[in-house]
C-alpha cells in the first residue's frame, strides 16, 4: 500500500489527511476507524457500485462494532442535482444521523461530489471519508475538497470546498470498471503530465498499453503520482485563488460540451480530452506551442481511445456556456493554455478571433 498525505495549512492549525492507495484495501476498515467518532456511519453509494461492494464493506465495518446506514442513489452524471442531494438528506434525517455521524462516499466522482456537499451542509458540517471506485475519482475528484452539484445552466455551479478526513483508493475496484470509464480516468492522469510534469507525460506515453490492460503496479504508480501532484497543488492553493486553476486544463471547453450534449452522454474525462485539444489548438495559434506538441497530445489521446474532436455546437453556444464558467473574472473568460508539455498558464486575453476560428475549424458535427 502507498500513502500520499495532503497537508493543508490554515489558521490557527494545520490540517491534513491521508490518501491510501493499494489493492484490496477496501477490506481493511482499520484504515478509517480512527476517523469514525461514533459507532454509526452513513454509506452513500449508487445502484452500480452498491451491488458490487456495499454489503462486504458493511460487514467488514460491523466486525469492529460499526452500524452502517446504506444510502443508494441512482447512477449517472444526470443525477448530480438537488433532487438526488435531497435523497441523502432525507435518509440522514430519517435515521437521525448526528453531527458526528460520518458519511462515507463509496463510488465514483458523482457519489463523492454529492456526499461531500451533503457532509458540508448537513447540520452545518459533518465528517466524511472518500472511498473512490473509479480511476477518475481516485486520481482527481476525491482529493482536494471540491464538492457540489450541477445546475441546468452549468456544471458544478453549486457547491462547497470541504475536505475529507481520509481517502481510500482501492485499485482492485478498477477490475469492475467499464473500459470507457477507465479511459475517461486516464484523461485526468494525462492532465497532470501536461500541466506540470513532462517526465510523467513521457512515462504515460510509454506505459499507456499497460494502463489500458489494468496492470496493477502501473495503475498504482499512476494513481500515486497523480495524487502527489494534486496534493501539492491543493496544499499551495486550497480555494483555487491561483495555481489550482491550472488543474482545469480542458475543463472550460469540456464543461460546455458536457452541458450542451446532456450530462452523462459525454463522460467527464472524454469532454476534458476533447476540450484539451481545443485548448492546445488555441495555444498553438497564439504562438505558445508548436504543432509537434499538439500532435503528441492528440496521439496519446487516440492511443487511449479518447475523443480528440469536440462536437460542433457553434461558437456562439460555446461562448455562452463558457461565460458561465467558475473561472470567469470581471466578465472575462480565463483559459488554461499550454506553454509546452509540462507547463500551463492562465490567460484572460485570448483574442476573440482565435476562439471563433478554433471553435469553427476544430470541431465536427456529433
Swiss-Prot record:
Cofactor entry: Co(2+); Zn(2+); NAD(+)
GO annotation, biological process: amino acid biosynthetic process; aromatic amino acid family biosynthetic process; chorismate biosynthetic process
Catalysed reactions listed for this entry: 7-phospho-2-dehydro-3-deoxy-D-arabino-heptonate = 3-dehydroquinate + phosphate
Keywords, alphabetical: Amino-acid biosynthesis, Aromatic amino acid biosynthesis, Cobalt, Cytoplasm, Lyase, Metal-binding, NAD, Nucleotide-binding, Zinc
Cellular component GO terms held in the UniProt record: cytoplasm
A Pfam short name: DHQ_synthase
Classification via InterPro entries: Dehydroquinate_synthase, DHQ_synth_AroB, DHQ_synth_fam, DHQS/DOIS_N, DHQS_C
Pathway: Metabolic intermediate biosynthesis; chorismate biosynthesis; chorismate from D-erythrose 4-phosphate and phosphoenolpyruvate: step 2/7
Positions contributing to Zn(2+) binding: 188, 251, 268
Recorded GO MF terms: 3-dehydroquinate synthase activity; metal ion binding; nucleotide binding
Cofactor binding, per record: Binds 1 divalent metal cation per subunit. Can use either Co(2+) or Zn(2+).
Subcellular location: Cytoplasm
Major localisation: cytoplasm
Residues given in the record as NAD(+) binding sites: 75-80, 109-113, 133-134, 146, 155, 173-176
E.C. number(s) listed in UniProt: 4.2.3.4
Domain of life: Bacteria
PANTHER family named among the record's database cross-references: 3-DEHYDROQUINATE SYNTHASE (PTHR43622), 3-DEHYDROQUINATE SYNTHASE, CHLOROPLASTIC (PTHR43622:SF7)
Primary role: Catalyzes the conversion of 3-deoxy-D-arabino-heptulosonate 7-phosphate (DAHP) to dehydroquinate (DHQ).
Recorded family membership: Belongs to the sugar phosphate cyclases superfamily. Dehydroquinate synthase family.
Name of the protein in its database record: 3-dehydroquinate synthase
Organism: Nitrosospira multiformis (strain ATCC 25196 / NCIMB 11849 / C 71)
Gene name of this polypeptide: aroB
